[in-house]
Amino acid sequence: MGNFSFTMFQILNLKMNLSLPYCNRSTGRICSKIRLYHRSFRSNPSLQMCFIIVFLLFIFSLIMFMKLNQNSYSGKEILGYLYETAIDQLTYNHTHAFITSAYYYRNSKSLGENAVAMIVAMSQRTFKHLENHEITIVGSRGYQNLKTKASITVETAEQMSCEYVMALIQGITLEIPQKLEIESAGTRVQIPFREPRKNSHSPVIICISPQFVAEKWQLFLMNIHVIRRYGGHMHIYITSMVEKLFNVLKIYEDMEALTIDYWIRMKLKKTSSPVADIMKNVEWRHQAGAQTDCLLQYKEVAEFIAFFDIDDILVPNFSHNYHQEFSSHFNAYPSYHSIFYGKRDVFVEKISSIEDFSFRHLFSNMKIQEETGYGKSIVNPLKYNSTWIHHSMKLPRNKMLKIMNTEIIHIKNILDSELNKDAPIHLPIIYGTETESVIREMDLKTLDFDFQTVYQNPIYREAALKMIDYNFYTPIVFNCYNESFYHPYFVEKKDFSQICPNADNCQLPQREDIKCIHSDGEYVSGPEMYPITFHYAVHPFWSNDIGCYQ
């Protein structure tokens, strides 16, 4: 009994009075986490007695349960388990998280009824195993409220050393909530949310990763018209972009050829303790968060969703459009959650003026390279709830169909040489074949006809003629990515446990002759909560006052 009493009060002291022997240098972070509760607990004898009674009742119930089940667990083993559990629950770090978006689904085909899904950049330092913990969500409508536990799914590469990673918080709530909150230790923070899209311009959505200091208008026009030709709809996220290019994209949006979405920087309005800059310490600038956001927006209305970069162009070689191409693969393998296309590097010649833009000449002068890259996914949104950059890290790879007879055209480089419009027209040949062309002649004619039709619009033509490819920020960003990831990973053979792929430390000089549009918003910091304080932004808008930054 003496050992029992001593161990019990060890646990009580650990939970309630860490100023005793447990409060030393090695356990200082534990002390700091519960110091807020310590004083009120010691000054309230009734609360102390209540805790002891509840604790003893729990021990008694546990022992009786073991006896009834004829399990030979000793009191020492039981208390050892309780002690380890207490230690595990208390050894967390106070961290911060940024909520990029939250959605409520009244009746989702895949998430269920009254489902909630939040995309959050979370710190891996919060818990030893982030996914083993739950988040309490409170949904309210009038005088009704419902508390539920939500799960955490982390989409990141194995052994990722970046402090912040993309996490999907998923749970259920009451019907048609007026308010959603996250609760911890009696403190709540209200979370802005919206419903997913109820319609789509196309059953095929091509999600384009967030753009920053984007200036290569030639890439954008190629991809916009190719996606449009094959029946897809582009959804593109923008952090910053050269203003003249942005103005042209807005015209395409008015034509319903694409949808532009905000991708604002994650900033913390206020904190009571030092915290690392999330944008500088998140994997790939939170690209997985943007792609998962696109998935959650369209998952109830799209049949297929693709995750591409702006320099990824897919031409369906054996079908007339994307829907036909993707349907043929998924119909043949109905249990598969996604299809996966590899990438082939190509070089294209530069076009200085939009007056010279021509798909037939661009493809005729295309240089197909031997080098390939890791590909991208097209998913069935009913079987996909979250994704990493190339594919989900949570779904079985043996249910991802790898397409072998078609490759994504990856525009690796726009050459310094000007597009030669006097060169003879010929179709580019698929690498490794002698006669199979990358694209059909009829498709090139259709692409050029579509572009010329758009170009005849006087509003479009006036804006498009102002576009200039400065080629100023692109080399800077390329070198930054090379120094921060590509060289360490591919040349020095370092893995993700040693490097955090992120280019936010790039120094981007400002030029008077280059103006950029930048996404921005109203930043909100919730009340300090343990173990996680939440932050977010509302009322996003486009700003031309920030400059050309990430």
UniProtKB/Swiss-Prot annotation:
- Is Membrane set as a keyword in this record? yes
InterPro entries for the chain: Glyco_transf_92 (IPR008166), GTase_92 (IPR052012)
- Which family, according to UniProt? Belongs to the glycosyltransferase 92 family.
Record localization: Membrane
List, alphabetically, the GO terms of the cellular component aspect: membrane
Q: Which PANTHER family match?
A: GLYCOSYLTRANSFERASE FAMILY 92 PROTEIN (PTHR21645), GLYCOSYLTRANSFERASE FAMILY 92 PROTEIN R07B7.12 (PTHR21645:SF19)
Chief localization: membrane
- Where is the chain membrane-spanning? 46-66
Give EC number(s), comma-separated: 2.4.1.-
Q: How does it sit in the membrane?
A: Single-pass membrane protein
Q: What is this protein called?
A: Glycosyltransferase family 92 protein R07B7.12
Instruction: Give an example GO molecular function.
Output: glycosyltransferase activity
This chain's source organism reads: Caenorhabditis elegans
- Cystine connections: none
Alphabetized, the UniProt keywords read:
Glycosyltransferase, Membrane, Transferase, Transmembrane, Transmembrane helix
Keyword field contains Transmembrane helix: yes
Task: Give the classification, highest ranks.
Answer: Eukaryota, Metazoa, Ecdysozoa, Nematoda, Chromadorea
Q: Where is the GT92 domain?
A: 203-487
